[in-house]
Design a protein with these regions (language model features):
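Amphipathic, small/basic residue-rich leader segments at the start of a protein or domain
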Residues: 1-83, 103-107
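Glycine-rich beta->alpha junctions and the first turn(s) of the following alpha-helix
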Residues: 3, 7, 186-238
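Buried hydrophobic positions in well-ordered alpha/beta secondary-structure cores of metabolic enzymes
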Residues: 20, 47, 70, 97, ...
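N-terminal glycine-rich flavin-associated loop
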Residues: 24, 81-100, 123-125
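A generic, well-ordered mixed alpha/beta core segment in the N-terminal half of proteins
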Residues: 96-112, 139
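A short, Trp-centered hydrophobic/proline-enriched beta-strand micro-motif
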Residues: 110-120
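A structural signal for short hydrophobic beta-strand segments in well-ordered beta-sheet cores
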Residues: 130-132
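A short core secondary-structure module
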Residues: 137, 143-184
Length: 238
């Protein structure tokens, strides 16, 4: 962290320190739904909740430096309720339009839906997850081995190699797949040292419409890596 921070960020950090002492610490280690709701409402009033959300949804997105300062500060407090301070961000759904914006991004930002990110492939997979595009429908096959929050997410945004019925490569794509889709199964659930939960997921003839592609064909890997980069900045700050 730079030793000389801009005055504006110093003021925000001071405000966050007061928020920890006056709002979060008095609640203690409670982490039930009521306590989480109390922190979220207080965070909205203080303005922290909206710093991870797009302007078009009422957010006031902060700079990478400001978010890093705040995340480091909240993590240093070592209180479980700090994870409820920031509102849900768009994640892999950043800049989507149409159906994906209305039925997935908007509910995520409103806290009505949760999504997971499917990127990592198991070593034992015969080939990376792929989909056949035919007549506007995608038929998906494959596995993802480390999907954080996948057991309870409403949907997963998965990196998939797309081809036509003859096997010609069309490019990679991030595809939104509802967790309860026919053919999607959870093969294993496990936890990591930080207490977060993960699943191994399989796709067997999972069929979704072409309009579930995030962006355009060929943009899948760059979009996935951008999402990973944003998460790594968050984790490093914490």
């Amino acid at each position: 962290m730079p030793e000389n921070l801009p005055e504006g960020i110093l003021r925000v950090r001071e405000s966050a320190e007061k928020f920890i002492e006056q709002v979060i610490r008095p609640i203690g280690d409670a982490d039930d739904a009521e306590a989480a709701s109390q922190v979220r409402e207080a965070s909205k009033e203080a303005g922290f909740f909206f710093k991870t959300q797009p302007e078009e949804f009422g957010g006031h997105p902060a700079s990478a430096l400001e978010l890093t300062v705040l995340r480091e500060l909240f993590a240093h407090a070592n209180l479980p309720l700090t994870r409820h301070v920031f509102g849900p961000g768009p994640g892999a759904l950043h800049a989507v339009e149409g159906k994906l914006k209305d039925e997935y991004l908007a509910p995520v930002l409103a806290g009505e839906k949760t999504g997971a990110f499917g990127f990592t492939e198991p070593d034992s997979a015969p080939r990376p997850t792929w989909a056949v595009l035919n007549n506007g429908m995608l038929t998906i096959h494959g596995q993802k081995s480390y999907v954080t929050g996948g057991a309870t997410a409403d949907f997963v945004s998965a990196l998939v190699n797309v081809e036509d019925p003859e096997g010609a490569k069309l490019g990679t794509a991030m595809i939104v797949i509802d967790r309860l889709s026919d053919g999607l199964s959870i093969e294993r659930e496990f936890s990591s040292l930080d207490g977060s939960s993960h699943v191994a997921m399989r796709f067997d003839n999972v069929i979704v419409a072409e309009d579930h592609i995030i962006g355009k064909l060929g943009e899948g890997l760059p979009r996935a890596l951008t999402n990973i980069g944003n998460v790594r900045m968050m984790v490093s700050a914490q």
